[in-house]
A protein has these predicted regions:
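Flexible, glycine/charged-enriched surface loops at secondary-structure junctions
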Residues: 103-109, 144-146, 213-231, 263, ...
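Mobile "lid/hinge" segments at catalytic clefts and subdomain interfaces of large enzymes
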Residues: 140-260, 448-547
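Long, basic N-terminal domains or extensions that often function
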Residues: 1-232
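Extended amphipathic alpha-helical scaffolds
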Residues: 1-45, 53, 230-369, 554-568, ...
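Conserved phosphate/anionic-ligand binding catalytic regions in large, soluble enzymes, centered on
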Residues: 27-29, 122-141, 328-351, 433-453, ...
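Glycine-rich, flexible beta-strand/loop modules in the N-terminal catalytic cores of phosphate-handling
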Residues: 25-110, 115-117, 122, 188, ...
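Single-stranded RNA-binding regions, centering on S1/OB-family and related RNA-binding modules
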Residues: 290, 552-556, 563-697
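Short, hydrophobic beta-strand segments
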Residues: 113, 185-190, 231-235, 246-256, ...
Length: 697
């Protein structure tokens, strides 16, 4: 039965239609915020997937180009693979949803959000987040909802709830917070060096707004919610754990995991697994789940060590950072390079500079975002964790990590006017044992400075973890988590920033939310840690951007011309500009405002191109001298090209001080001659003279 529900949210109407579409899905709703419309659905398989030790949740966010009145580009004229924005939005939707499903649930679940119409006043990503939580809560799929999501912008220091697209892009804060009735469950932020206290204020304001959305969802569930279906639990039997402890006592497991060497720990666990497999050889059911059982045994052991004994697997104190190292100029001939090492996590970052014509083109739903000038790409090869696997290109994780490190540096990058380059940073993971995205942030910051990019401040990043007990007051926040603490802990709270404030946050958890004291402690810890990293390690390798770009990087000269003269520089069908490029070997970019960038590696050729452009666009006065080439000879005179696409005529009477009968007696096609401007002739053409050129010229 069709029902429609509405509420006012930040000055706009949020409408949810239930029972109108997609009746065969486990849960479906047509969600509208203003005119932005997203179809949200959720489906689940009838039976659990066998032979897996994880929850198979898939989240899709589909950007339909018809939603903004566009036909997709390309040959097929239909939507292709997901855009980077769609992938990142899917990840943001996934992170608050995943912890609210039962931990022992193994049925396949797919959440899909299809963007059908976009109102610039209401961001479709937010609608997808609200719709995902709503349809899963009203469905028959086991889910401990509801949760809700709010976005917060900031313009001129004022916080704006659910900002429109312009406020979101041009403001100083892009914050997304998901929460349950009592706790924060996900934080994602990009910021322009926002102070910690202001960030906390924005987070708590989002949480308060979320409560109104949760009340709205509760109302819908009361009328349209389905009874949750029963499912087959995939939990490890307690009797199996008891048998494992008889064979491998807790003290033995603790000894196996207590080492700062990842490879040693993994070898210890392999030996324990082999020992248990031998003991359970006749129990096929237990053998089938032995890997997951050993994982859970490790997890319980590590959590107890941290929570009860304040003892970390590698012996560090709770707030201690792993050994750090930083260096620049590791790779020769590239435009900039740096390596950052934290324990057994090591990132090499390489920066490449190029003219603005090399910016990444973006074909998305936002008409105001068509290019991306700064690109950060993150690679995670199998060898970084000692595995063998064929690389098949970046996956969602790699794209997400690259985007986070990219976001971390955006606030400190120079403007196009200050530094007219396209910039690409590539983070190569040499070694991984947790928090490679934060190491990528540190490495890329140093690499940018080494490349001569005049960033406004140094940026560093660090991640905090968490282990909780049975009550909200029983918890331990860990500074700089390694892989094991990430896998077995409850939180990965990544924060990047400068001395002044925060530039990015990404928080995801495995429990049902964080209390305010935990959020505050994590933000305070990350500030303390990142200041230490910048002051004691990164600044020792490089403390400020180099004044010049690398000798191997392209050089750029910028000039401004009258926008009305752009056509003269370009010429008919690009003839003039292409001739300048052919003569000098440079690249030329011209903006609609008349800003011209001349890019090349040969400074002489670049200056020659600039002179040509200035010559073409300058209004000439009588008496100016030029050097040009004879390009045409007529009975009455010769035409001299003094700049690409620019010609003036020398009348036969102005060629020589002596009388001549034929132009060819003195001039030949291709001759280089010096001429003086005599003004314009009756036809408006530049009139030149050769004979009146001063002898000293």
């Amino acid at each position: 039965m069709f029902k429609s529900f509405s509420m006012e949210l930040a000055g706009r109407t949020l409408t949810v239609d239930i029972g109108r579409v997609c009746a065969q899905a486990n849960g479906a709703a047509l969600v509208k915020y203003g005119d932005t419309t997203v179809l949200s659905t959720v489906t689940a398989s009838v039976k659990p997937r066998e032979g897996i030790d994880f929850f198979p949740l898939s989240v899709e966010y589909e950007e339909k180009m018809y939603s903004v009145g566009k036909i997709p580009g390309g040959f097929n004229k239909r939507e292709g693979k997901a855009s980077e924005n769609a992938i990142l939005t899917s990840r943001v939707i996934d992170r608050p949803m995943r912890p609210l499903f039962p931990k022992d649930y193994r049925n396949d679940v797919t959440i899909n959000n299809m963007v059908m119409a976009v109102d610039p006043e209401c961001r479709p990503e937010l609608v997808g987040m609200i719709g995902s939580a709503l349809v899963t809560t009203i469905s028959d799929i086991p889910f401990d909802g509801p949760c809700a999501t709010t976005q917060m912008g900031m313009v001129n220091g004022e916080l704006i709830v659910n900002p429109n697209q312009e406020q979101w892009i041009n403001g100083d804060l892009q914050l997304t917070v998901a929460s349950t009735r009592t706790k924060v469950i996900m934080i994602e932020a990009g910021a322009n060096e926002v102070p910690e206290d202001k960030m906390l204020e924005a987070i708590y304001k989002c949480h308060d707004v979320n409560q109104t959305v949760i009340e709205f969802i509760d109302k819908i569930v009361a009328e349209c919610g389905k009874e949750k279906h029963e499912y087959t639990s995939c939990a490890i039997p307690e009797e199996m754990f008891a048998a494992m402890k008889e064979i491998v006592p807790p003290e033995a497991m603790e000894e196996a995991v207590f080492t700062d060497e990842k490879q040693v720990r993994e070898e210890n666990i392999r030996e324990i697994t082999d020992k248990l497999a031998e003991a359970f050889a006749e129990n096929e059911e237990w053998l089938a789940i032995l890997g997951e059982a050993v994982y859970q045994y490790q997890k319980k052991t590590v959590r107890k060590m941290i929570l009860k004994d304040h003892k970390r697997p590698d012996g560090r104190a709770i707030n201690q950072i792993r050994p750090l190292a930083a260096e620049v100029d590791l790779i020769p001939r590239v435009h900039g390079s740096a390596m950052f090492t934290r324990g057994q996590t090591q990132i090499c970052d390489v920066v490449t500079l190029a003219p603005l014509s090399e910016v990444q083109k973006v074909d998305g739903l936002d008409a105001n975002v068509t290019t991306k000038r700064y690109m950060h790409h993150y690679n995670f090869p199998a060898y970084s964790v000692g595995e063998t696997k064929v690389s098949r290109g970046p996956g969602r994780r790699e794209i997400g990590h690259g985007a986070l490190a990219e976001k971390a540096l955006m606030a400190v990058l120079p403007t196009e006017e200050e530094f007219p380059y396209a910039i690409r940073a590539v983070s190569e993971t040499f070694e991984s044992n947790g928090s490679t995205s934060m190491a990528s942030t540190c490495a890329s910051c140093m690499s940018l400075m080494a490349a001569g990019v005049p960033i406004k401040a140094m940026v560093a990043g660090i991640s905090c973890g968490l282990v909780t007990g049975d009550t909200d007051d029983e918890y331990i926040v860990l500074t700089d988590i390694q892989g094991l603490e990430d896998f077995f802990g409850d939180m990965d709270f990544k924060v990047t920033g400068t001395h002044k404030g925060i530039t990015a946050i990404q928080m995801d958890i495995k429990i049902h939310g964080l209390t305010r004291p935990i959020v505050e402690e994590a933000i305070a810890r990350t500030r303390e840690a990142r200041l230490y990293i910048m002051d004691e390690v990164m600044s020792k390798a490089i403390d400020k951007p180099r004044k010049e770009v690398s000798e191997y990087a392209p050089k750029i000269i910028q000039i401004s011309i009258d926008p009305e003269k752009i056509g003269d520089v370009v010429g008919q069908k690009g003839k003039t500009i292409n001739e300048i490029i052919a003569r000098t070997g440079v690249k030329i970019d011209i903006s609609e405002e008349g800003n011209v960038s001349v890019c090349g590696t040969d400074l002489k050729m670049m200056e020659s191109a600039v002179d040509m452009i200035r010559t073409i666009t300058t209004e000439f006065e009588e008496g100016q001298l030029f050097t040009g080439k004879v390009v045409s000879i007529k009975e009455f005179g010769a035409f001299v090209e003094f700049a690409p696409g620019k010609e003036g005529m020398v009348h036969i009477s102005k060629i020589s001080k002596e009388r001549i009968n034929h132009v060819e007696d003195v001039l030949t096609l291709g001759d280089t001659v010096k001429v003086i401007c005599m003004g314009k002739d009756k036809m408006g053409r530049m009139s030149f003279s050769i004979k009146d050129v001063p002898a000293e010229a």
